[in-house]
């Protein structure tokens, strides 16, 4: 109504009032429209998933609301962007964790250390160590702990204030039993001897082999060993190869095992003989080899009680010989 009234007036002063009134109305019209909240608008733009509009339809949002979206604001001004990868401050103790290493000695370790010093072992030291049981130490008081969380072995209370727990690392008490020679392969100058040792028995650190040459004076006399034997020490395996033997010669061999407790007994003498050399019958590049195998005899023990003995007596009366 105001604009139509001013158009009817035609003098110069009223034209000036018309222009100023239009400017005021335009300013009021701009202030009447709600100003969009940049942060609330930014929530729609920065979200990766496509949201529905306030009108309740995805189609309406695409057709009607797309033109009303404001320009994309920088992510640094947004408070709820899904691309936010900020990391909360971490504690200094997590950046520099304390690393602990726990080790326990085992029997193989001690066997390797004491392998070459069996003669220096004393029975008193072994008996004293066995009273403590196993080698796992459990500190019970703070006085035994050195700075840094390590066990103080210089503290005399460690020997008295420790508890033994089941462990695989135990002190060896008994010497190993005698091995059994099970196989040998001979030629005219070499011999490969193998022996067995029952698993589950005393632990073995190494073996010792003694070899002697047997000489026959007459056919009716028993063989006699020479006074100069060969001794092979610290054999880790259960097979040995003897080189540079005399052809067509008899030898006598015996083996024993050793561990940290000492050396065991020698096995029964094992006799073998090398093959005779006959260059006319067999070529030199194809020598003869003979292999002999044997099994350890099995012993079975039968125990009978009083009732079993009475049953046997009754059977004797019923079925006499």
UniProtKB/Swiss-Prot annotation:
SUPFAM superfamilies named in the record: Fibronectin type III
Domain Fibronectin type-III stretches: 175-277
InterPro entries, sorted: FN3_dom, FN3_sf, Ig-like_fold
SMART domains in UniProt: FN3
Name of this protein: Fibronectin type III domain-containing protein 8
Phylogenetic lineage: Eukaryota, Metazoa, Chordata, Craniata, Vertebrata
Gene: FNDC8
């Amino acid at each position: 109504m105001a604009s139509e009234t001013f158009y009817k007036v035609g003098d110069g002063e009223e034209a000036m009032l018309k222009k100023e009134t239009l400017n005021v109305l335009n300013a009021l019209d701009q202030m009447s429209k709600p100003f969009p909240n940049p942060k609330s608008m930014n929530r729609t733009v920065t979200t990766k998933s496509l949201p529905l509009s306030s009108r309740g339809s995805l189609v309406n949002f695409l057709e009607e609301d797309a033109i009303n979206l404001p320009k994309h604001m920088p992510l640094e001004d947004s408070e709820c962007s899904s691309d936010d990868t900020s990391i909360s401050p971490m504690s200094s103790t997590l950046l520099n964790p304390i690393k602990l290493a726990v080790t326990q000695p085992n029997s193989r370790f001690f066997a390797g250390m004491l392998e070459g010093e069996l003669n220096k072992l004393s029975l008193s030291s072994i008996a004293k160590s066995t009273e403590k049981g196993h080698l796992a130490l459990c500190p019970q008081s703070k006085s035994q702990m050195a700075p840094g969380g390590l066990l103080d072995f210089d503290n005399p209370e460690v020997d008295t204030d420790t508890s033994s727990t089941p462990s695989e690392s135990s002190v060896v008490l008994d010497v190993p039993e005698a091995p059994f020679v099970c196989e040998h392969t001979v030629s005219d100058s070499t011999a490969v001897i193998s022996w067995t040792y029952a698993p589950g028995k005393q632990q073995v650190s190494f073996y010792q082999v003694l070899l002697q040459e047997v000489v026959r004076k007459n056919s009716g006399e028993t063989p006699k060993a020479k006074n100069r034997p060969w001794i092979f020490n610290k054999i880790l395996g259960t097979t040995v190869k003897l080189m540079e033997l005399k052809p067509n010669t008899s030898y006598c061999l015996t083996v024993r095992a050793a561990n940290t407790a000492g050396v065991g007994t020698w096995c029964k003498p094992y006799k073998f003989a090398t093959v005779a050399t006959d260059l006319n019958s067999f070529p030199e590049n194809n020598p003869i080899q003979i292999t002999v195998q044997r099994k350890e005899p099995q012993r079975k023990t039968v125990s009978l009680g009083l009732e079993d003995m009475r049953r046997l007596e009754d059977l004797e009366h019923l079925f006499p010989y």
